[in-house]
């Protein structure tokens, strides 16, 4: 099975150019491929995982990935999928953002010894001379064809229109492909479905200038079963940078996956074998919740390392309760499977508050405690939450808004508060307190 077959089976592929030729090439020889990453933020987010994982699969199957960071094109701004012009950013900001992106990509891709490359297109774009570029590159582009591209057509039909600086973006991205093909023998560009027009333009430019056949592959737009974009929550984006989204919150994002998405997300966002993932489609109930835990653990392990994943899994056990993970469920995962081995200690990454026995001795009104720990914005909101049946202590519904949380509620030196279905906070009483 070639890497193209693997990507197809796991759900990465929406469209190819020259499909059979590409399949044959990938099956017969090592292929150098590239994907571009936008340096408009200091961190990539979950929405970038599909292209990152695709590069990782390429490398794991003997091919050489190139991660191109758009230090040059980022100064222009890609109009694809945008209804208005992006805010232009400074070269200094782009350079700082590239450093953060490189650190994150290194979690997924091995750059040691030339096994993969990270390049910055500012190295060749910022030194281009305008007139020679128009004569040597611009002459190969038809404006009539360019404005038929989806990314340009949408903007031309919008109220804001398309700026001249953005109109040049397709030429610059096509030039990237030409440069990487000539200098690095790169023959495959991959990207999101909104990049189809830019990718095809690059393929055409390489053919005209170098007389070489190169290829393109695009990914589908990945949404949840409810239609939401990947990586977006009520609290904002889910970042790959641990300083912006903690490993615990990252783990929680994945464990809250909808039932219908579990098998699909295991295919896309972990490296677990497909035969094991296919079995997940046949399970339900508690086993499906265990599969979500495996998804969360594996996704966190890949992005943040094994230690962070184990700690996030342990912290979740403290807040949500321990569970055994069946040995025959996704057996290739390294997730701790014995409930007795998880949740043994609280690291401080899970939401928690320390209290003394003295504070609990007389009891604290539940609505006051819910407000104090941040499970409600006000005491009035906390009262309403409890009155409507949404307040819990140790998974036991609070029947009255006059209920007082006390030492009698302690379970193994902890009290777990819950607001609604998914918001938890742990009260921890340390020994000797």
Swiss-Prot record:
Short motif 'HIGH' region, span: 39-48
GO cellular-component term (any): cytosol
InterPro entries to which the protein is assigned, alphabetical: aa-tRNA-synth_Ic, Rossmann-like_a/b/a_fold, S4_RNA-bd_sf, SYY-like_C, Tyr-tRNA-ligase, Tyr-tRNA-ligase_bac-type, Tyr-tRNA-ligase_bac_1
Subunit structure: Homodimer.
PROSITE patterns in UniProt: S4
MF (Gene Ontology): ATP binding; RNA binding; tyrosine-tRNA ligase activity
Keyword Calcium attributed: no
Residue ranges occupied by any S4 RNA-binding domain in the UniProt entry: 364-432
Subcellular location: Cytoplasm
Entry EC no(s): 6.1.1.1
Catalytic activity: tRNA(Tyr) + L-tyrosine + ATP = L-tyrosyl-tRNA(Tyr) + AMP + diphosphate + H(+)
Binding of ATP, residues: 232
Binding locations of L-tyrosine: 34, 169, 173
Principal location: cytoplasm
Name of the featured protein: Tyrosine--tRNA ligase
Organism ancestry: Bacteria, Pseudomonadati, Thermodesulfobacteriota, Desulfobacteria, Desulfobacterales
UniProt family annotation: Belongs to the class-I aminoacyl-tRNA synthetase family. TyrS type 1 subfamily.
Organism the protein comes from: Desulfosudis oleivorans (strain DSM 6200 / JCM 39069 / Hxd3)
This protein's record includes keyword Nucleotide-binding: yes
Function: Catalyzes the attachment of tyrosine to tRNA(Tyr) in a two-step reaction: tyrosine is first activated by ATP to form Tyr-AMP and then transferred to the acceptor end of tRNA(Tyr).
GO terms of biological process kind: tyrosyl-tRNA aminoacylation
Motif residue range(s): 'KMSKS' region: 229-233
Keywords: Aminoacyl-tRNA synthetase, ATP-binding, Cytoplasm, Ligase, Nucleotide-binding, Protein biosynthesis, RNA-binding
């Amino acid at each position: 099975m070639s890497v193209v077959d693997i990507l197809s089976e796991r759900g990465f592929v929406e469209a190819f150019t020259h499909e059979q030729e590409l399949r044959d090439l990938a099956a017969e020889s090592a292929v150098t491929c590239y994907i571009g990453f936008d340096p408009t933020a200091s961190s990539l987010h979950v929405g970038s995982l599909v292209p990152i994982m695709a590069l990782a699969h390429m490398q794991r199957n003997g091919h050489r990935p190139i991660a191109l960071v758009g230090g040059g094109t980022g100064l222009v701004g890609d109009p694809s999928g945008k209804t208005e012009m992006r805010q232009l950013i400074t070269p200094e900001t782009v350079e700082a953002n590239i450093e953060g992106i490189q650190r994150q990509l290194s979690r997924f891709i091995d750059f040691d010894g030339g096994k993969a490359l990270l390049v910055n297109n500012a190295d060749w774009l910022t030194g281009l001379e305008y007139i020679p570029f128009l004569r040597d590159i611009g002459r190969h582009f038809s404006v009539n064809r360019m404005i038929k591209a989806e990314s340009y057509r949408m903007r031309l039909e919008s109220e804001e229109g398309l700026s001249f600086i953005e109109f040049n973006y397709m030429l610059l991205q096509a030039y990237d492909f030409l440069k990487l093909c000539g200098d690095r023998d790169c023959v495959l560009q991959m990207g999101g479905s909104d990049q189809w027009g830019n990718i095809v333009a690059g393929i055409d430019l390489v053919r005209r200038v170098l007389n070489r056949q190169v290829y393109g592959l695009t990914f589908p737009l990945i949404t949840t079963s409810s239609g939401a974009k990947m990586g977006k929550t009520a609290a904002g984006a889910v970042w790959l940078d641990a300083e912006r989204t903690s490993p615990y919150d990252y783990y929680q994002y994945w464990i809250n996956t909808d039932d219908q998405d579990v098998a699909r997300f295991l295919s896309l966002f972990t490296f677990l074998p497909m035969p094991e993932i296919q079995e997940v489609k046949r399970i339900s109930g508690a086993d499906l919740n265990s599969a979500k835990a495996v998804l969360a653990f594996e996704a966190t392990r890949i992005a943040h390392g094994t230690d962070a994943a184990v700690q996030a899994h342990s912290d979740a056990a403290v807040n949500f309760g321990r569970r055994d993970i069946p040995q025959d469920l996704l057996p290739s995962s390294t997730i701790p499977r014995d409930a007795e081995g998880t949740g043994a200690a609280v690291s401080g990454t899970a939401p928690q508050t320390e209290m003394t026995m003295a504070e609990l001795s007389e009891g604290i009104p539940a609505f006051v405690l819910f407000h104090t720990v941040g499970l409600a914005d006000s005491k009035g909101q906390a009262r309403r939450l409890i009155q409507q049946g949404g307040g819990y202590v140790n998974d036991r519904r609070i029947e009255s808004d006059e209920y007082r949380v006390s030492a009698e509620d302690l379970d193994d030196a902890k009290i777990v508060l819950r607001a609604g279905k998914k918001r938890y906070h742990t009260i921890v009483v340390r020994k000797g307190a």
